[in-house]
Amino acid sequence: MTKSELFERIAERKAHISNKIIECAVKEMLEYISISLSKGKRIEIRGFGTFSLHYRSSRIGRNPKTGKKIKLNERYIPYFKPGKQLRDRANYK
């Protein structure tokens, strides 16, 4: 699902809220999550999940086109761990 599809789906469910407000709220939430992660903070949304950073140590990788070995530097990557309620909803049959 793209951001624009998300805006449309929310607008369908919440017809009393303008599309501009929905778009602004979603963009602001995503921006806040990005800024918080860039500062090394963890974001927990109860019932939905937790956004955090995971450390990856340096290692030797391989260029998929050439097969040449390259050194990959240490880095942090964004990580999302779904909460129990989200996991339960995803596995509901």
Curated annotation (Swiss-Prot):
Gene3D superfamilies: IHF-like DNA-binding proteins
One Pfam entry name: Bac_DNA_binding
Key words of the record: DNA recombination, DNA-binding, Transcription, Transcription regulation, Translation regulation
GO cellular component, one term: chromosome
Similarity section: Belongs to the bacterial histone-like protein family.
PANTHER family on file: DNA-BINDING PROTEIN HU, INTEGRATION HOST FACTOR SUBUNIT BETA
Function recorded in the entry: This protein is one of the two subunits of integration host factor, a specific DNA-binding protein that functions in genetic recombination as well as in transcriptional and translational control.
Quaternary state and interactors: Heterodimer of an alpha and a beta chain.
Protein name: Integration host factor subunit beta
Source organism of the structure: Buchnera aphidicola subsp. Schizaphis graminum (strain Sg)
